[in-house]
């Protein structure tokens, strides 16, 4: 695929439906023989699996970096970057990726979504029609997420509120108990902190620092 053959950083990826089978280069488990796996010259890994859902294609881009890659001054940068990927990129500036999803019958949350964990950031797209044009453009969107996020100042400013709202919603008794438990179990390590981040760090995040982390 030409979308991921550039000279940018290698980004591991695999089909969403292949995730359970797992990507194992070594170990005791035998990979599912139905999964076609490979690696492009730039190090980008891929896996393909024919699924029983006719007329639909599920794509996942799995970036091998999450909140564990953050310094204390970057708490929440991986999660913030995940948000910003949808707001503007090289081929889809100013939120035009959202228009592409809508024009092709996809809805945010259901068909286009993402999440950040400690060791990965995952973008998922489910195509409601499996024609070549839609597939080609969807791969371009994921390629942009991998190496073409723009970090426009206006996008960073608009997403501040969104990310901080998510943090506020999580600031419940249950959420605080979980934070205390993680601190007790993992205090002093990267495992102590949730990917959502630190409100103070998020509020001070600049486009330049976010792009440097990216």
Regions found by a protein language model. Name each.
Residues 29, 87-91, 125-159:
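M16/insulysin-pitrilysin zinc metalloprotease superfamily fold
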Residues 58-126, 173, 192-196:
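M16/MPP (pitrilysin/insulinase) zinc-metallopeptidase core fold and M16-derived inactive scaffolds
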């Amino acid at each position: 695929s030409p979308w991921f053959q550039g000279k940018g950083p290698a980004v591991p990826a695999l089909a969403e439906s292949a995730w359970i089978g797992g990507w194992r280069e070594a170990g005791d488990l035998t990979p599912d023989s139905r999964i076609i796996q490979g690696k492009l010259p730039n190090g980008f890994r891929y896996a393909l699996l024919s699924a029983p859902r006719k007329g639909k294609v599920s794509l996942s881009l799995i970036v091998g970096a999450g909140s564990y890659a953050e310094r204390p001054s970057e708490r929440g940068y991986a999660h913030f970057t995940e948000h910003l990927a949808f707001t503007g990129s090289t081929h889809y500036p100013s939120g035009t990726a959202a228009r592409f999803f809508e024009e092709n019958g996809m809805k945010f949350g259901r068909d286009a979504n993402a999440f950040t964990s400690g060791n990965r950031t995952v973008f998922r797209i489910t195509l409601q029609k499996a024609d070549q044009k839609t597939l080609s453009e969807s791969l371009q969107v994921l390629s942009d997420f991998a190496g073409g996020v723009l970090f426009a100042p206006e996008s960073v400013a608009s997403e501040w509120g969104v990310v901080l709202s998510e943090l506020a919603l999580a600031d419940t008794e249950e959420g605080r108990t979980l934070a205390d438990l993680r601190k007790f179990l993992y205090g002093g390590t990267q495992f102590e902190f949730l990917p959502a981040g630190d409100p103070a760090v998020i509020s001070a995040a600049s486009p330049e620092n976010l792009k440097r982390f990216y």
